[in-house]
Amino acid sequence: MNKRKLNYTKLWKILKSRGLTRYYLVNNALGYTMSTATLAKLGKGQSVTTETLLDICNLLDVDLDEIVETEVIVTDE
């Protein structure tokens, strides 16, 4: 059975296209703050809360499908 994992490549592309760094998610002018631990999870493609993803969407004024997608991991099972 194949598994899926989250991929945040779209998020990183949006930040880059806007001239922003990943640390904009930690410290920004809008007052939204994210822990560096959560930023590390995003960087590793790990799960974060839905609330965190929605906060990022609100911060960047995008929809969820614009920042995250799933990718299939093929297993031998």
Show where each model-derived region lies.
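A short, Lys/Arg-rich alpha-helix, primarily the initiator
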Residues: 1-23
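Key DNA-contacting residues within the recognition helix of helix-turn-helix
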Residues: 26, 39-40, 54, 68
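Short, basic-rich loop-to-helix N-cap that marks the start of a DNA-contacting helix
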Residues: 45-58, 76
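Short C-terminal boundary/hinge segments that cap the last helix of small helical domains
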Residues: 61-77
